[in-house]
Amino acid sequence: MQRALPASAYWIEPQRLAAGAYPAAPFDLAVLIAAGIGGFVDLTPAGDHGGYASEAARLARAAGREALHRRFPIRDFGLPEIATMRAILDAIDGWLAARRPVYVHCHAGLGRTGTVVACWLVRHGRAPADALAELQRLRHGTRDAAAASPETDAQRAFVESWRPGN
Protein backbone atom coordinates (compact mmCIF):
# COMPACT_ATOMS: atom_id res chain seq x y z
CA MET A 1 0.00 0.00 0.00
CA GLN A 2 1.28 3.46 -0.93
CA ARG A 3 2.03 5.75 1.97
CA ALA A 4 0.23 9.08 1.98
CA LEU A 5 1.95 12.23 0.78
CA PRO A 6 1.07 15.93 1.13
CA ALA A 7 -1.67 17.18 -1.22
CA SER A 8 0.88 18.78 -3.56
CA ALA A 9 3.07 15.67 -3.86
CA TYR A 10 3.00 12.43 -5.85
CA TRP A 11 4.91 9.17 -6.13
CA ILE A 12 6.98 8.54 -9.26
CA GLU A 13 7.99 5.14 -7.93
CA PRO A 14 5.92 4.17 -4.88
CA GLN A 15 7.87 4.20 -1.62
CA ARG A 16 11.07 5.17 -3.49
CA LEU A 17 10.78 8.46 -5.36
CA ALA A 18 8.31 11.30 -4.81
CA ALA A 19 8.09 14.90 -5.95
CA GLY A 20 6.09 18.01 -5.25
CA ALA A 21 6.11 21.43 -3.63
CA TYR A 22 8.50 22.85 -1.05
CA PRO A 23 7.73 21.22 2.32
CA ALA A 24 7.27 24.53 4.13
CA ALA A 25 4.44 23.46 6.44
CA PRO A 26 5.57 21.40 9.44
CA PHE A 27 2.70 18.98 8.76
CA ASP A 28 3.88 18.36 5.17
CA LEU A 29 7.43 17.67 6.35
CA ALA A 30 6.15 15.26 9.00
CA VAL A 31 4.02 13.46 6.39
CA LEU A 32 7.05 13.08 4.09
CA ILE A 33 9.18 11.67 6.91
CA ALA A 34 6.33 9.32 7.90
CA ALA A 35 6.17 8.18 4.26
CA GLY A 36 9.80 7.09 4.59
CA ILE A 37 11.51 9.93 2.72
CA GLY A 38 15.17 10.07 3.71
CA GLY A 39 16.68 12.24 0.96
CA PHE A 40 15.52 15.70 -0.06
CA VAL A 41 16.62 17.13 -3.43
CA ASP A 42 15.97 20.87 -3.13
CA LEU A 43 15.95 22.83 -6.40
CA THR A 44 15.40 26.25 -4.81
CA PRO A 45 18.16 28.84 -4.43
CA ALA A 46 19.43 29.37 -0.89
CA GLY A 47 17.49 32.12 0.82
CA ASP A 48 14.23 31.55 -1.07
CA HIS A 49 12.77 29.86 2.03
CA GLY A 50 13.64 29.56 5.68
CA GLY A 51 15.00 26.03 5.35
CA TYR A 52 13.79 22.74 6.73
CA ALA A 53 16.84 20.42 6.70
CA SER A 54 17.42 20.51 10.46
CA GLU A 55 13.73 19.89 11.22
CA ALA A 56 13.66 17.00 8.71
CA ALA A 57 16.74 15.51 10.38
CA ARG A 58 15.12 15.88 13.82
CA LEU A 59 11.86 14.23 12.70
CA ALA A 60 13.76 11.41 11.01
CA ARG A 61 15.93 10.81 14.10
CA ALA A 62 12.77 10.59 16.21
CA ALA A 63 11.62 7.85 13.83
CA GLY A 64 14.98 6.05 14.07
CA ARG A 65 16.11 7.12 10.59
CA GLU A 66 18.23 9.74 8.89
CA ALA A 67 17.15 12.54 6.53
CA LEU A 68 19.69 14.10 4.17
CA HIS A 69 19.33 17.30 2.15
CA ARG A 70 21.08 18.37 -1.08
CA ARG A 71 20.50 21.69 -2.78
CA PHE A 72 20.86 22.17 -6.53
CA PRO A 73 19.80 25.81 -7.00
CA ILE A 74 17.88 26.60 -10.17
CA ARG A 75 16.18 29.99 -10.54
CA ASP A 76 12.38 29.98 -10.68
CA PHE A 77 11.12 29.12 -14.18
CA GLY A 78 14.74 28.41 -15.13
CA LEU A 79 16.78 25.52 -16.41
CA PRO A 80 19.89 23.82 -15.06
CA GLU A 81 23.07 23.40 -17.04
CA ILE A 82 23.37 19.90 -18.53
CA ALA A 83 26.13 19.04 -16.03
CA THR A 84 23.89 20.18 -13.17
CA MET A 85 21.01 18.03 -14.40
CA ARG A 86 23.40 15.06 -14.54
CA ALA A 87 24.48 15.78 -10.95
CA ILE A 88 20.84 16.01 -9.80
CA LEU A 89 19.93 12.72 -11.47
CA ASP A 90 23.09 11.07 -10.10
CA ALA A 91 22.17 12.23 -6.58
CA ILE A 92 18.66 10.80 -6.94
CA ASP A 93 19.93 7.51 -8.33
CA GLY A 94 22.66 7.27 -5.69
CA TRP A 95 20.20 7.65 -2.85
CA LEU A 96 17.77 5.21 -4.48
CA ALA A 97 20.59 2.67 -4.90
CA ALA A 98 21.32 3.11 -1.18
CA ARG A 99 17.62 2.38 -0.47
CA ARG A 100 17.00 5.95 0.65
CA PRO A 101 13.58 7.17 -0.58
CA VAL A 102 13.87 10.59 -2.23
CA TYR A 103 11.67 13.68 -2.43
CA VAL A 104 12.40 16.19 -5.24
CA HIS A 105 10.99 19.70 -4.97
CA CYS A 106 11.24 23.32 -5.99
CA HIS A 107 8.81 25.97 -4.73
CA ALA A 108 5.47 24.96 -6.27
CA GLY A 109 6.65 21.56 -7.48
CA LEU A 110 5.81 22.30 -11.10
CA GLY A 111 8.49 23.78 -13.37
CA ARG A 112 11.90 22.85 -12.04
CA THR A 113 10.58 19.73 -10.31
CA GLY A 114 8.67 18.58 -13.40
CA THR A 115 11.75 19.13 -15.55
CA VAL A 116 13.91 17.00 -13.24
CA VAL A 117 11.29 14.24 -12.89
CA ALA A 118 10.76 14.03 -16.66
CA CYS A 119 14.53 13.90 -17.29
CA TRP A 120 14.83 11.17 -14.64
CA LEU A 121 12.12 9.19 -16.46
CA VAL A 122 14.03 9.64 -19.75
CA ARG A 123 17.25 8.47 -18.07
CA HIS A 124 15.37 5.34 -17.04
CA GLY A 125 14.07 4.42 -20.47
CA ARG A 126 11.12 6.64 -21.33
CA ALA A 127 11.02 8.59 -24.56
CA PRO A 128 10.85 12.33 -23.79
CA ALA A 129 7.24 12.70 -25.00
CA ASP A 130 6.23 9.64 -22.98
CA ALA A 131 8.01 11.02 -19.90
CA LEU A 132 6.08 14.29 -20.16
CA ALA A 133 2.78 12.41 -20.54
CA GLU A 134 3.65 10.10 -17.63
CA LEU A 135 4.42 13.12 -15.46
CA GLN A 136 0.89 14.46 -16.03
CA ARG A 137 -0.58 11.05 -15.18
CA LEU A 138 1.47 10.80 -11.99
CA ARG A 139 0.35 14.26 -10.88
CA HIS A 140 -3.35 13.42 -11.31
CA GLY A 141 -5.10 13.92 -7.99
CA THR A 142 -2.60 16.41 -6.58
CA ARG A 143 -3.78 19.80 -5.38
CA ASP A 144 -2.47 21.52 -8.53
CA ALA A 145 -2.88 18.73 -11.09
CA ALA A 146 -4.43 21.13 -13.63
CA ALA A 147 -1.28 23.28 -13.74
CA ALA A 148 1.35 22.62 -16.40
CA SER A 149 4.45 20.70 -15.34
CA PRO A 150 7.04 21.55 -16.57
CA GLU A 151 5.71 25.11 -16.65
CA THR A 152 7.54 26.78 -19.54
CA ASP A 153 8.15 25.99 -23.19
CA ALA A 154 11.90 26.12 -22.50
CA GLN A 155 11.57 23.54 -19.72
CA ARG A 156 9.55 21.22 -21.97
CA ALA A 157 12.10 21.69 -24.79
CA PHE A 158 14.89 20.81 -22.34
CA VAL A 159 13.12 17.51 -21.54
CA GLU A 160 12.44 16.84 -25.23
CA SER A 161 16.16 17.24 -25.97
CA TRP A 162 17.28 15.12 -23.00
CA ARG A 163 18.74 11.70 -23.82
CA PRO A 164 19.49 8.76 -21.48
CA GLY A 165 23.23 9.18 -22.04
CA ASN A 166 23.27 12.87 -21.09
Q: Where do the protein language model's features map onto the residues?
A:
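C-terminal domain-closing interface element
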Residues: F158-N166
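Cysteine-based protein phosphatase catalytic domain of the PTP/DSP
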Residues: L5-P6, E13-V102, R123-A154
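Short, flexible helix/strand-to-coil boundary loops that buttress conserved ligand/catalytic motifs
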Residues: T44, V117, R163
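Short, small-residue alpha-helix embedded
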Residues: T113-H124
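Non-catalytic regulatory/accessory regions that flank a structured catalytic core
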Residues: M1-R3
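Conserved G/P- and acidic residue-centered "switch" motifs that form tight phosphate/ATP-binding loops
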Residues: G109
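Short cysteine clusters
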Residues: C106
